Amino acid sequence: NGQKKYVMNYKNSLKHGLYTEWSIDGRLTKDIEYDMGRPISEYIVEYEGQGYIELNRRNGELSGSWIEWYANGRKSEEGVYKYGKKGGLWTAWYENGEKKYHSKYIDGKPDGIYTEYDSKGRLTANIEYDLGNILTEYHITRDEGGSTEYHKKNGVLDGRWTRWYANGNKAEEGLYEEGKRSGTWNGWYRSNKKHYKSLYADGKRAGTYSEWNSKGKKTKEIDYSNGNRIREYLLIKDGSGYM
């Protein structure tokens, strides 16, 4: 079609200097600097569907900026490679322009705080890394019924766990220790009235579990020991009753 394909310089029959290449529709695809046949530095554009990736190499290894673009012209991901490995700050975005995540890398390993967002710009995760090893995690998940916030340590639930209704009121809250429920857990109705209160030790119910109806009247008490029911007390219309 008459479109230029490439321009190359030679010295003593060897590639030397700048080599430039274009696609059939005239888009730049390569700028490669040669030294007597050996590629020193490379700038490459790889077209994938309607988007594309810009990357750099030095002495055959990824080195320098790396940028991925959406078809709409917005950035998808950007960062830097050092000696073939991710280094420094990396950031990604959704196609609508909202930030997706940002993270720091050292020698190809995530280090420090990794932060993630959903496509509406709301925080979904904060994860602390130490050279690729996860130290602590904070997550918030959302669905039609509401949202859940929780923490992890060493890969298991550890710390406060909270469930929220879609109207913003709390549904349930308590603590995890090393993957097991611990201490006092409380639950609420959507109206914000108390639903239950329960105690846990090593993931098992302990002490007195109390329950209320949606009008705020206590309806039940159950005593537990090591997860086993010891006594159950139901409140009936006249205010008393055992079972």
Regions found by a protein language model. Give the residues of each.
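Glycine/tyrosine- and acidic-biased, solvent-exposed loop/turn segments at the edges of beta-strands
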Residues: 1-243
